[in-house]
């Protein structure tokens, strides 16, 4: 378990991280989300040990994170590859800088390339790789020394839907043996691999955003088996009714609606209801609501 307690950091007299506290559980993938300049990358660099905070503590298994540097893997938002190197050469170069010996690298390089789906590109020059392949190579570099804590900064931000899907599937596989934190603004994609999300803005944690399907009790969508006949809107005072199509209507109000009472009223008016349900609230909508007033 990784425990972050009352973390605070100022740079050039500007408060960047303000009393940050949270926990990352073992084999959890935690998503860190927030608008630009919220402090996400700075927080991740503190977790990696690259930046030391002014105050607070970061512990891993009850010991300072600085005593676990060999257990941490880090992928920055912009990975600096040498484009003329092959995938194998790049990993070998990075591995030697990290203190891994030749025998270990001979064993680990084929293994990590296979794990990230680049075993057929082992001798491929990096400049010929797609964006998604480069990101997977970056993750291969981050896990080369077999860390137990993996930090990923926007790993899928510049990728197409297929590339983002591949990265999220890879993260799902990795979290079976690692604890992971990933910063992202691609919420609907990241919910595939993240167990929960924390929202940060202006260096402060606004709170958790769970990865559950929430509903808006102020909006109800009704689908019918046949086109809806004329009905009396006066039965629904202070309710806005939108006709999506002849067999689909949305009811909206400023206050929570009673779903069962609405169903009874519609049936009494001759509606043949196929389904009636509160409208789901997406992660992005909940995130925008959370940061709007801060």
Task: Give the role of each language-model region.
Residues 48:
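Helix-to-loop junction immediately C-terminal to a conserved catalytic motif
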Residues 219-290:
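Short, charged/small-residue-rich alpha-helical element at the C-terminal edge
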């Amino acid at each position: 378990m990784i425990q972050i307690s009352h973390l605070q950091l100022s740079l050039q007299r500007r408060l960047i991280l303000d009393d940050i506290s949270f926990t990352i559980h073992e084999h959890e993938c935690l998503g860190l989300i927030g608008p630009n300049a919220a402090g996400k990358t700075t927080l991740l660099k503190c977790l990696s040990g690259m930046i030391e905070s002014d105050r607070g503590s970061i512990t891993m298994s009850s010991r300072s994170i600085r005593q676990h540097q060999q257990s941490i893997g880090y992928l920055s938002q912009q990975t600096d590859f040498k484009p003329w190197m092959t995938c194998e050469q790049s990993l070998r170069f990075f591995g030697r800088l990290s203190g891994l010996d030749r025998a270990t690298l001979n064993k680990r390089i084929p293994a990590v390339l296979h794990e990230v789906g680049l075993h057929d590109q082992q001798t491929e020059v990096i400049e010929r790789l797609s964006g998604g392949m480069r990101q997977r190579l970056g993750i291969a570099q981050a896990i080369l020394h077999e860390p137990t804590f993996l930090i990923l900064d926007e790993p899928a931000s510049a990728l197409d839907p297929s590339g983002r899907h591949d990265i999220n599937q890879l993260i799902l596989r990795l979290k079976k043996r690692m604890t992971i934190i990933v910063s992202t603004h691609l919420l609907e994609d990241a919910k595939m691999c993240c167990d929960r999300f924390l929202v940060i803005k202006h260096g402060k944690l606004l709170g958790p955003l769970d990865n559950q399907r929430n509903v808006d009790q102020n909006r109800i969508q009704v689908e019918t088996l046949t086109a809806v006949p004329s009905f009396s809107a006066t039965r629904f005072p202070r309710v806005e009714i939108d006709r999506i199509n002849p067999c689909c209507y949305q009811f909206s109000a400023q206050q929570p609606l009673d779903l069962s009472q609405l169903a009874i009223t519609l049936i009494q008016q001759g509606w043949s209801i196929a389904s009636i349900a509160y409208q789901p609230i997406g992660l992005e909508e909940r995130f925008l609501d959370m940061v709007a007033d801060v």
